[in-house]
C-alpha cells in the first residue's frame, strides 16, 4: 500500500498511543513461565506481539483473550512442550532472541524461522553465549541466520560482556539464567532497556543490579518459580515519539500523550527533544509494575541541532531515524554517532534514512555508525521507500506534514508491525 501525507497547519489534541511493544512481548513470555494465571491489560495487539502469542501457544501455553484482556495460564519453569512444527517468528527479532533464551532451558528440539527481513538479521550474538551456557544451537551461516534449531538442557551460568548494549541479547541470557546452575551475569558499558530485569524482579526472581567502573552489572540465579503478574501495559514511548516530533516541528502545535512509559532507559528521545528546544513536560508520574509512567505534553518551539553521543544511543535507539528526520527542520547541524546497531534492524536504518533524504533532495552525510544532517532544509516532497520498516514509514510520514507537495510512502502498511492505527491517529490530530 502507498500512503501520501500532506502539509498541515498544526498538530493538536490528546492521544493514548498503542501500548509498549517491549513490555507486551515480555509480559507474554514471562507469564508463560509463571506458576498460575497472569492478567495482561492494554496489551499491544499488533503484528510482532501477536507473533509472540502464537509462538507460546505452540509451546503449549494457554493464552486466552477476553474483551481485550489477555489471560496467560503459565506452565511454570519446566512446563513448556516441544513444538510439533516450526516456530514462525514473523518479523520479530525480540520474539526470536528472547525465545532462544527460554528454549535454552528445555531439553527438547525446536526450530525457528521468520520472514525475509528477519532471516537476514544476526542471531549469533545470542546463539554464542547460549551455546557457552550449554544449549545446542545450529542454523544458517554457522548459526548466525534463521532458520535456527535449538535443543536446550543442562545450563551453567556465565559472565557476559554485552558490548553491543542490546537489550535483546541481555534478556536472552538472563532468561536462560533462570534455568542455569550458578550465577548468570551480564555487564554493559551503558545500560540498555531494563524491562526484563524489572519484570523478573516483580515476579519474585533473584535479580541483583549495580553500577560499577565497568558499567551496568545485572545478575540472576536459577529460579524455582516465577509468580504470575497483573499488569497494565503503558503506552509505547517509541510510538509516542512520532507525535511529539510532529508537534515540535510545526508552528502552533501542542499535544498531550497519555500513559507513556518514561523508563530512563527508554525516554532518551524526549530528553533530546527538550535539549533541541521543544517544550516537553512530564505530568502525573506514577508506577506500573516497576515501570515509571507519565502524561507527556509537547509544544512547538524552534529547534536547534544537537549531538547524539554513543552513550546516549541505547535510550533512543528506535527513535534515532526520527530524530535524524526532524533534524532537517532544526537550526544548525545534527551529528549522530555510535548508532551502528541501526544497521541490523528491520532495515539498515542509517542507509534507509540517507537514501530517502536523497530522494527528497535533502542534504545529509552517512557515517559508518550514524549521520550528519544539515538543518533548516525546505522539504518539497516526493516518493520514499519504507523498506517495509515500520519506523522508517512513520518517520517520513511525519516529515510529510511539513512538505510543500506531500510525501508518498511505499509499503506503508508495514506500520501494522507496531502501530496499526498510526495513520488514523495522525489524521485525528492534524488540523
Swiss-Prot record:
One of its GO terms (cellular component) is cytoplasm. Its EC number is 2.5.1.19. GO terms for molecular function: 3-phosphoshikimate 1-carboxyvinyltransferase activity. 3-phosphoshikimate binds at residues 21-22, 26, 166, 168, 318, 345. Its main location: cytoplasm. Pfam families: EPSP_synthase. It is found in: Cytoplasm. GO terms for biological process: amino acid biosynthetic process; aromatic amino acid family biosynthetic process; chorismate biosynthetic process. Phosphoenolpyruvate binds at residues 21, 93, 121, 168, 349, 391. PROSITE patterns: EPSP_SYNTHASE_1, EPSP_SYNTHASE_2. The active site is at residue 318. It catalyses: 3-phosphoshikimate + phosphoenolpyruvate = 5-O-(1-carboxyvinyl)-3-phosphoshikimate + phosphate. CDD domains: EPSP_synthase (cd01556). InterPro entries: Enolpyruvate_Tfrase_dom, Enolpyruvate_Tfrase_sf, EPSP_synthase, EPSP_synthase_CS, RNA3'P_cycl/enolpyr_Trfase_a/b. Keywords: Amino-acid biosynthesis, Aromatic amino acid biosynthesis, Cytoplasm, Transferase. It is an enzyme of class 2 (transferase). Pathway: Metabolic intermediate biosynthesis; chorismate biosynthesis; chorismate from D-erythrose 4-phosphate and phosphoenolpyruvate: step 6/7. Belongs to the EPSP synthase family. Monomer. HAMAP family: EPSP_synth (MF_00210). Catalyzes the transfer of the enolpyruvyl moiety of phosphoenolpyruvate (PEP) to the 5-hydroxyl of shikimate-3-phosphate (S3P) to produce enolpyruvyl shikimate-3-phosphate and inorganic phosphate. This is 3-phosphoshikimate 1-carboxyvinyltransferase. It comes from Sulfurihydrogenibium sp. (strain YO3AOP1). The gene is aroA.
Amino acid at each position: 500500500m502507498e500512503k501520501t501525507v500532506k502539509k498541515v497547519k498544526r498538530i493538536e489534541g490528546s492521544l493514548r498511543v498503542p501500548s509498549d511493544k517491549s513490555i507486551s512481548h515480555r509480559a507474554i513470555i514471562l507469564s508463560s513461565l509463571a506458576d498460575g494465571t497472569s492478567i495482561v491489560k492494554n496489551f499491544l495487539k499488533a503484528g510482532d506481539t501477536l507473533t509472540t502469542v502464537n509462538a507460546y501457544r505452540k509451546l503449549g501455553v494457554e493464552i486466552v483473550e477476553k474483551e481485550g484482556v489477555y489471560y496467560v495460564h503459565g506452565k511454570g519453569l519446566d512446563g513448556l512442550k516441544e513444538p510439533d512444527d516450526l516456530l514462525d517468528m514473523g518479523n520479530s527479532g525480540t520474539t526470536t532472541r528472547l525465545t532462544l533464551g527460554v528454549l535454552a532451558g528445555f531439553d527438547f528440539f525446536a526450530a525457528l524461522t521468520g520472514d525475509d527481513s528477519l532471516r537476514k538479521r544476526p542471531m549469533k550474538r545470542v546463539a554464542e553465549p547460549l551455546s557457552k551456557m550449554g544449549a545446542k544451537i545450529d542454523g544458517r551461516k554457522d548459526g548466525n541466520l534463521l532458520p535456527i534449531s535449538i535443543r536446550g538442557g543442562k545450563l551453567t551460568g556465565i559472565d557476559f560482556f554485552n558490548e553491543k548494549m542490546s537489550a535483546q541479547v541481555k534478556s536472552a541470557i538472563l532468561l536462560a539464567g533462570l534455568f542455569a546452575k550458578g550465577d548468570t551475569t551480564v555487564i554493559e558499558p551503558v545500560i540498555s532497556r531494563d524491562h526484563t530485569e524489572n519484570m523478573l524482579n516483580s515476579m519474585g526472581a533473584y535479580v541483583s543490579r549495580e553500577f560499577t567502573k565497568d558499567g551496568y552489572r545485572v545478575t540472576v540465579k536459577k529460579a524455582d518459580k516465577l509468580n504470575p503478574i497483573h499488569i497494565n501495559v503503558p503506552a509505547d514511548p517509541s510510538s509516542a515519539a512520532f507525535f511529539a516530533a510532529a508537534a515540535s516541528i510545526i508552528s502552533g502545535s501542542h499535544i498531550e500523550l497519555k500513559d507513556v512509559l518514561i523508563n530512563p532507559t527508554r525516554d532518551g528521545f524526549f530528553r533530546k527533544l527538550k535539549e533541541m528546544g521543544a517544550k516537553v513536560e512530564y505530568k502525573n508520574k506514577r508506577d506500573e509494575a516497576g515501570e515509571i509512567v507519565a502524561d507527556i505534553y509537547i509544544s512547538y518551539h524552534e529547534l536547534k541541532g544537537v549531538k547524539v553521543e554513543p552513550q546516549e544511543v541505547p535510550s533512543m535507539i528506535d527513535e534515532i531515524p526520527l530524530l535524524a528526520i526532524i533534524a532537517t527542520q532544526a537550526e544548525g547541524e545534527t551529528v549522530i554517532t555510535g548508532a551502528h546497531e541501526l544497521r541490523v534492524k528491520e532495515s539498515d536504518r542509517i542507509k534507509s534514512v540517507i537514501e530517502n533524504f536523497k530522494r527528497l533532495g535533502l542534504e545529509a552525510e552517512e557515517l559508518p555508525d550514524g549521520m550528519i544532517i544539515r538543518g533548516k532544509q525546505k522539504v518539497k516532497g516526493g516518493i520514499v521507500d519504507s523498506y517495509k520498516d515500520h519506523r522508517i514509514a512513520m518517520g517520513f510520514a511525519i516529515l510529510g506534514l511539513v512538505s510543500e507537495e506531500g510525501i508518498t510512502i511505499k509499503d506503508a502498511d508495514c506500520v501494522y508491525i507496531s502501530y496499526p492505527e498510526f495513520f488514523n491517529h495522525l489524521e485525528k490530530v492534524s488540523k
